[in-house]
């Protein structure tokens, strides 16, 4: 199973620390973390990361690039962390949560 975790915040705080600890301790699952380039260096080096530039809720080009990246990875699950990340992913996937 392949799982993509998304963290699009600008600072490394509670959610990001939780994701860091979660991904270090997950076994037998192929996990990839997509995160903001400004916080990528704070995650443990054992975590497979893809850094992206900051994406705003209204950034059409940023959303397009994120959707293309997720489609290229072809995960079984996309796990969002944080309300901003969830709203961005929901807006690029009109079939989410139905």
Where are these regions (language model features)?
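Structural motif
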Residues: 2, 76-77
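Proline-aspartate-enriched helix->loop->beta-strand connector
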Residues: 70, 74-76
């Amino acid at each position: 199973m392949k799982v993509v975790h998304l963290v699009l915040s600008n600072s490394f705080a509670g959610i990001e620390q939780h994701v860091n600890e979660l991904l270090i301790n997950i076994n037998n699952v192929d996990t990839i973390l997509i995160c903001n380039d400004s916080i990528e260096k704070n995650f443990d080096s054992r975590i497979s990361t893809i850094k992206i530039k900051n994406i705003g809720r209204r950034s059409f080009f940023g959303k397009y690039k994120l959707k293309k990246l997720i489609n290229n990875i072809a995960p079984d699950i996309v796990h969002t962390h944080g309300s901003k990340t969830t709203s961005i992913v929901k807006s690029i996937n009109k079939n989410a949560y139905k």
